């Protein structure tokens, strides 16, 4: 069985377009490499501009990803355009029904 993950990306100043482009190609690359399932990925934006992504890793793929040069390079590009944000820092997570603005992938 895979693992569902939810991750927050805070765009660095002037980097939101680059972050959105990278997020749109993220899961398709992981799928091509056999690391993510075909379950539809979701992306959304918090009130303060954090991009939230939800997708499913294949069983055992998280460990494999940390050793794959293409994934490591992609994560390096993420580091150039964003900072990772714990979900607990998003004000929406304090609401019973957290609401976000949808982003088309």
How does the language model describe each region?
Residues 2-10, 52-54:
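Active-site-flanking beta-strand signature of metal-NTP-handling nucleotidyl enzymes
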Residues 6, 40-41:
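A general structural-boundary detector
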Residues 10-22:
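Short, surface-exposed ligand-recognition loops at beta-strand->loop->(often short) alpha-helix junctions
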Residues 14-16, 48, 60-62, 95:
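Generic "edge-of-domain/loop-turn" microfeature
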Residues 23, 27:
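Short amphipathic alpha-helical/adjacent loop interface patches that line ligand
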Residues 28-40, 55-92:
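An amphipathic, aromatic/His-enriched active-site/gating alpha helix that lines ligand/cofactor pockets
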Residues 42-48:
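A short beta-turn/loop motif at secondary-structure boundaries
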Residues 92-105:
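Short, low-order "capping/linker" segments at domain edges
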